[in-house]
A protein has these predicted regions:
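Short, well-ordered, aromatic-rich surface patches in folded extracellular/luminal domains
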Residues: 1-17, 48, 63, 70-143
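Short, flexible N-terminal segments of the mature chain
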Residues: 21-43
Length: 143
């Protein structure tokens, strides 16, 4: 049996809830990773894209397994939280090409190392991939 993975991942970020100021998109089948930033009126201000190589994709795949995210679907309580993102928010959306329905999970809570959600682990790995590229287009972006 093949393990279902997310084929598309989106992480929306903002300072005012509901207004997206930045977005990370991962398209697994196309091996594309992009970052977009938006202005106050939600107009696209900047868009940067990367085509991921085999090593970068392999580093992301363990974090894309849909089964890791299922225990958090519809969860309202936040066990073992440490704190909240200060004056900002993030929202994870994962879509698979299999039987697993789309999942949306908030990323506003900071957990201790023993209780980190898979959304946090995936986000951190995406940031590591971006930073390892040392692409000058990403240098001024706070991820």
């Amino acid at each position: 049996m093949t393990t279902a993975i997310f084929s598309k991942v989106q992480v929306d970020m903002g300072q005012f809830y509901g207004r997206v100021s930045a977005r990370i998109l991962l398209n697994v089948p196309q091996r594309e990773l992009s970052y977009q930033s938006f202005g106050e009126k939600q107009e696209l201000k900047n868009s940067i894209g990367l085509v991921l190589d085999e090593t970068e994709m392999q580093s992301l795949l363990p974090f894309l397994r849909a089964e890791l995210f299922e225990p958090y679907r519809d969860r309202e309580d936040m066990h073992d939280e440490v704190g909240y993102l200060d004056e900002s928010w993030r929202m994870f959306t994962g879509i698979s090409d299999s039987h697993v329905p789309m999942i949306r999970l908030p990323m506003n809570v900071i957990h201790d190392l023993a209780h980190r959600w898979p959304t946090e682990l995936l986000y951190e790995q995406i940031v590591r991939v971006i930073r390892a590229r040392n692409d000058r287009r990403f240098r001024k972006i706070a991820l």
